[in-house]
Amino acid sequence: MGMWEEASDTGMKGKKKKKDKNEEEEEERGKKERMVNLTLEMIYLLTGEHYIPRKKSDDGGALHAPGSVIQKENNKNDEKILELMSNIIQLLTGEVAIRTHHVSIYFSLDEWDNIKGNKVLYEEGIKEEPQQLHPLDCEYEDKRDITADLGGTLCYNNETSKIGAEGTDFCAKENLTISPVEQPPPANRIKEERASCEEGNQSDCSINPLTEQIQGTDKPTPIMGYSLNNSSANYIKEEVVQCHEGNHSDMRIITAPESILETNTSAAMIRCNLNTSLSASCEGGNQSDCRINELTEQIQGTDTPTGNIVLYICSECQKHFSTKAGLARHQKTHSVFVGEEHAYGRIHTEEKPFPCSECGKRFARRQHLTDHQSSHTGEKPYACSQCEKYFPHRSNLNRHLKLHKGEKPFPCSQCGKRFPCVSDLNIHRRVHTGERPYSCSECGKCFKHHSNLTNHQRTHTREKPFSCTECGKGFKDRSSLTVHHRTHTGEKPFSCTECGKGFKDRSSLTVHHRTH
């Protein structure tokens, strides 16, 4: 009887094993059929045509091979299917995927061009076996291991733990994660600082080291300004937070490094996302209160088409900057600080809060107003140290200094004459083009220079703002006043090279030259 039952059990096991095998084969056939249907549907979406699959006939008859050979062929087919699907995803999304075990990491095409030579290195880093994490010298029910695996639960506890007054389950569900958008190379490691539970009654709520979760996203968001290189020795340090009241259990929080070395090499980016303001209280039995201090670091940014990594965007003009200081400097161009009154001349609004009391002309900055007022007063505060000539504006002095240095970096393309600044070159070009952009509103006469127009307009208004301090005679321009001063001083700076006779102005010298 016993032998019959044993034989019957053996037969049942064989049937069950055969049934399980048949179910697996059926499931495999169903999976392949679904894949074929999805492929045909994809072909229809791409071409708009329906196709019917037809089994390929073997001319040489059926081939019989051992099961291991067939299994290898199936594995190769699976790998080929995955490769084809990756190529399709790359065409549709512009992203290249590296898949290893549970991890999927997506790279943009620009990033992939930079790192595809190190594909094996990335895969080796991803394939590292999950680390087994154990409670340290603590009583732990049924001695279960907690694997630092993807999506793993942080800790187990028989009794429900709560966070603050919310009553939220902490030990069973709460996750603190550092989520790399793209896996860093193996050179970057996690350093664990061991902690030991003090002797005595231990809390039932043993909170094990928080695990690192690697999450692959369809659209990764790299951190701008922060990158990791294969050679960098930066690592994420695991800090130990201890409860200091009574009997307690140790708690660990993985914190992001304060600074990540920035390199020129395109490599894996990481995003730190730590939950904020956690206050955990383990209740029940002989337990102690635990507190997790606020720990938050969230780095965000957007990538640029050029591959440069940026963080900060100007809200006025949308210009990108890699540092906060650079953005702050740029924003001052939108709000120009003026004097002690804290008045602001807005570039975009063209506000000009400083008017000239003489002519009513307005300026955005007080310094510009001060420079302009010197044209009314005749003040020339800027002196040349080489020839002691004076100028009303610093820009005029800088232009004059180039004459002493012999700097004339701007040549005319027509005649080859060179000039110390661009503005002088632009004015000179009007000689060749005949351009006279400044016209008089009274008579329509045109002039090459704005100063000539200003002097001409005074003939209509009969304005003579420049008066002689000796005799009080007025003149419409400063050059006429300067020439007049020479009648009082007797100065004759222009001399004839033929006879040596001197003249007080250049025009008189030109008339004299005609006599020779």
From Swiss-Prot:
Polar residues bias spans: 200-218
Protein name (record): Gastrula zinc finger protein XlCGF53.1
Organism in which the protein naturally occurs: Xenopus laevis
UniProt xrefs under Pfam families: zf-C2H2
First and last residues of each zinc finger (C2H2-type): 312-334, 354-376, 382-404, 410-432, 438-460, 466-488, 494-516
Keywords: DNA-binding, Metal-binding, Nucleus, Repeat, Transcription, Transcription regulation, Zinc, Zinc-finger
Localization, UniProt: Nucleus
Gene3D superfamilies per UniProt: Classic Zinc Finger
Role according to the record: May be involved in transcriptional regulation.
A GO biological process held by the record: regulation of transcription by RNA polymerase II
Similarity field: Belongs to the krueppel C2H2-type zinc-finger protein family.
Domain of life: Eukaryota
Main location: nucleus
Region entry Disordered, spans: 1-33, 200-220
Gene Ontology CC: one annotated term: nucleus
GO molecular function, one term: RNA polymerase II cis-regulatory region sequence-specific DNA binding
